[in-house]
Amino acid sequence: LRNAGTALGFALGQARALLGSGRPALIFVQLAHEANETGLIYGPGLAQFGIDPDAVTLVRAETVSDLLWAVEEAVVCTAVAGVVADVATPHKALDFTISRRLALRAEAAGTSAILVRYGLEREASAARYRWRVMPAASRPPPFDTRAPGLPRFLVTLEKGRLAGLAEGTSITIDWTKDNGFAVADPGRSADEDAAR
């Protein structure tokens, strides 16, 4: 769980891109006992990712079965842009069959389900994409080089093909408040990358 914040930040950045006037809601689902250990999402933090905290519904499920039921029901709601399910520990119920069912339901409804998992072991999944996400050192902001910069992620596409990225490709991406993710250019600041 060491990089839990990084994985969740990457998932929230993806979820932000899904939100729109026709689908203004985001559902965040977490096991209650895991939330006690890993923490909850934070309104001002959501705002930093361009997500209105009022657009997010937080679901704390008691069991994995309840969590999966909540995800499955939420993806078919016409107001929901996406569902982020944060699952910290391995569970037998999260197998290929359930991931396939969730993927098919989300695709049929025109929405997305983002399942955030932690750990180094791969698990069978019908997900279209699987990313391995690690933190990367951020660039300091230009006004104070000692201050932390905006989030930066080292991501590896483990499954799927996306915008010319082949499986196994790793890239560093910056988070920009206005434009979301941008591929990092080592010679520029995150704001300069976003302005290009």
Locations of regions flagged by a protein language model:
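N-terminal regions of ATP-driven nucleic-acid and macromolecular assemblies
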Residues: L1-R196
